[in-house]
Amino acid sequence: MSSQQQESEASGYNTSASSEFGSLEDSHQFVSPVTRHASKRRAVENVDHLDELMKSSMVLSPEKRLRLNTSNDSNLVRNTARSPDSSMNGRPQTRRSTSSDIEISPRVRAMRSTSGSSMDLVRTVSSFCTDSISPKFFTNHGSTTRKRTENGSIYSRHRLGATFSPLVAGAKRKMATPSQSLKRQEKQSPLESRHGGLRSRGTPQRKLLLCDRLKVLN
């Protein structure tokens, strides 16, 4: 038998031409996956022993290790028998703060309370609104008349242009730029502009002449 054939047989496959397609059992031998120089360590069969090995290899804080040891009932009995105050060995468990510790403000408590009364809900909403007034609040809830004109009908004069399409009708209308007629009027006083234009939203006040003012005072 040639050295090449010996090598092929040692590798587990019979590749020689004289095999004459023998049966699979003869020609193919399964090679064990263990390498030649591997150490044959016996696996730990005892589960408890394996568990102890695993726990000892873990990097843990003393209290976590104590908790891990006392988690098992048999371990707990064993440990308490060994040392009566084993629970005092580690640092006490850290108390996690919960949301219940935080003091809730009365307004938020009122908002969260679900008493079911619609009047309570109205009261809650109104208290919330008056508590935190913002420009957005004014624009949304300020003047009902202005709101009505601002949204307007989709067939309003502003929306119908030379190029009207139903696509535009669904779109949000831009705020109109100040027209020429507004520019002709007197400029807004700084006091009024400071109020976000809310003063000028109502009925336009006529400027009283000095003589008329004096008449009112008398």
Curated annotation (Swiss-Prot):
Q: Could you tell me the superkingdom of the organism this chain comes from?
A: Eukaryota
**Where in the sequence does UniProt note compositional bias of the Polar residues kind?**
1-21, 68-102
Q: Where is this region: Disordered?
A: 1-39, 63-116, 170-205
Q: Where is the composition biased (Basic and acidic residues)?
A: 183-195
Could you identify this protein by its name?
Answer: Uncharacterized protein B0304.2
